[in-house]
């Protein structure tokens, strides 16, 4: 017995030693670079221009509804007036009536270009909430150190930030070695099927193959990573897919005084409950696992130990992360019942009821896998079909070992000293889904600091962006272009 206990004790000590060695020898994957000091931005003037853009109600509507044409055309004219050097130096094309494509030719046209993306459209303001806004949603008010209004954060901060950065570089006499492309969509919030899709098709027809693409997406997480005081630039290297499934239940209709054992509403409600109680399995892989790999070396030892030893602690880490919606969404295909229809009067039984359940699909899963899961979970008697035409598969994962990702890390370190950077899985969708065939290196990042409370404002009430943070975003875009497209001065005339 004593011998057995001794062997067990030695085994435990060896295990602890292995765990501690793995945790204590993790190498940092951060990039350290000298801070940039020669990119002065007039924060107040830049904020005024962003505020002006917010005042245009460029609301995108579902397919089949009219575009807010005048608002987009007015915004186009505003951008032209606000950034005169951009519009004198770059070529601008209007795509699909309202999207914009800019080209800044490089003096080495044989180099693959870079593509910076964002979108000009915004989601509607929820009817009835207008009075809950501190400042009217399309006022573009500047107050308390913030620019307020719908689209300030999603995503006019990127559209204007990119243009401000390019305007700054032109003013400094910068000439890109490689071509710089800017693509601003007009219907991202409803899938990008007209604007972004048309722009991607146009670039493909021209044989354009960008070295890398950057769109909106991950943010600078401020106070949102447990164990880390430093803000973290969450650079999304992949995004989830999307599908909404329509569930249909049928039963006998008639008067509520003589109901069947199960009404159509009861059947569809039970189906939704089964889906909520039986989510698709969690996995720690892909971009989420890489995020842990980048952040674990920066954590205190106690927090680092389980992440450095997922071979042992993965089940426990999954249980811990599944307790919070945000972290749970990084590990699994999520299930969200969003709409239900089944009644017209309190004493009338309809013969049919429907529910719509939205799934954000984890890379490694698929639309087909979601449908199979739904059918097996809700059981027979419930109709299952894909709703609408916005279904999309998860994106491929862009590699963090590529020079393009390191370029983003370097720019973060130069513009935001002391900030960490890590890959990330984006739970939402972006216009990049239409551009995936153009480049294997696709990233999603907005260089603006955000707290957990700020996230609720995006698509919600009191959307805003800090004047100071916006100036930082302008510097980031300018430095990113310098890093990616800079080089020796172009040769002079012979």
Language model feature labels by segment:
Residues 4-43, 48, 90, 218-238, ...:
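Metal-dependent amide/peptide-bond hydrolase catalytic core
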Residues 12-150, 171-176:
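Acidic/His- and Gly-rich active-site-bordering loop/insert found
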Residues 60-61, 109, 120-123, 187-191, ...:
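Solvent-exposed loop/turn segments at secondary-structure junctions
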Residues 101-103, 213, 246:
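Conserved hydrophobic/aromatic beta-strand scaffold that supports enzyme active sites
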Residues 110-113, 176-180, 208-211, 417-419, ...:
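Loop/turn elements at helix/coil->beta-strand transitions in domains of secreted/extracellular proteins
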Residues 146-147, 151-234:
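Acidic/histidine-rich catalytic neighborhood of metal-dependent amide-processing enzymes
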């Amino acid at each position: 017995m004593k011998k057995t206990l001794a062997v067990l004790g030695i085994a435990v000590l060896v295990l602890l030693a292995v765990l501690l060695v793995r945790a204590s020898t993790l190498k940092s994957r951060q990039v350290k670079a000298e801070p940039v000091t020669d990119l002065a931005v007039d924060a107040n003037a830049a904020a005024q221009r962003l505020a002006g853009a917010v005042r245009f109600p460029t609301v995108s509507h579902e397919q089949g509804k009219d575009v807010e044409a005048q608002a987009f055309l007015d915004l186009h004219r505003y951008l032209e007036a606000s950034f005169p050097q951009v519009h004198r130096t770059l070529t601008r094309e209007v795509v699909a009536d309202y999207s914009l494509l800019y080209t800044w030719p490089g003096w080495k046209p044989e180099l693959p270009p870079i593509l910076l993306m964002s979108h000009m459209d915004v989601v509607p303001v929820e009817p009835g909430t207008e009075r809950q806004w501190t400042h009217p949603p399309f006022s573009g008010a500047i107050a308390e150190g913030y620019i307020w209004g719908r689209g300030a954060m999603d995503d006019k901060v990127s559209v204007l930030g990119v243009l401000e950065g390019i305007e700054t570089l032109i003013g400094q006499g910068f000439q890109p070695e490689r071509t710089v492309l800017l693509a601003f969509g007009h219907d991202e919030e409803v899938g990008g099927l007209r604007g972004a899709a048309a722009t991607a098709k146009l670039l493909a027809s021209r044989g354009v193959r960008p070295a890398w693409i950057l769109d909106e997406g991950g943010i600078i997480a401020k106070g949102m990573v447990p164990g880390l005081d430093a803000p973290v630039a969450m650079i999304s290297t992949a995004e989830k897919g999307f599908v909404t499934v329509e569930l249909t239940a049928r039963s006998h209709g008639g008067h509520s005084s003589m109901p069947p054992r199960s009404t159509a509403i009861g059947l569809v409600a039970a189906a939704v409950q089964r889906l909520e109680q039986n989510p698709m399995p969690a996995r720690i892989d892909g971009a989420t696992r890489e995020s842990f790999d980048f952040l674990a070396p920066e954590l205190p030892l106690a927090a680092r130990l389980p992440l450095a030893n997922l071979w042992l602690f993965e089940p426990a880490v999954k249980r811990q992360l599944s307790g919070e919606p945000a972290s749970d969404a990084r590990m699994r295909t999520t299930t969200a019942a969003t709409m239900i229809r089944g009644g017209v009067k309190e004493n009338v039984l309809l013969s049919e009821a429907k529910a719509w359940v939205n799934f954000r699909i984890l890379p490694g899963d698929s639309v087909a896998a979601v449908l199979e899961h739904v059918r097996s979970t809700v059981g027979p008697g419930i109709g299952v079909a894909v709703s609408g035409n916005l279904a999309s598969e998860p994106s491929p994962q862009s590699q963090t070992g590529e020079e393009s990702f390191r370029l983003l890390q370097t720019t973060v370190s130069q513009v935001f000293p002391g900030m960490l950077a890590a890959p990330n899985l984006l739970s939402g969708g972006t216009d990049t889904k239409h551009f995936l065939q153009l480049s294997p290196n696709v990233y999603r990042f907005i260089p603006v600091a955000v707290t957990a409370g700020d996230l609720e404002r995006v698509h919600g009430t009191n959307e805003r962006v800090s004047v100071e943070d916006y100036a930082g975003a302008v510097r980031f875009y300018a430095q990113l272009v310098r890093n990616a497209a800079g080089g020796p001065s172009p040769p002079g005339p012979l």
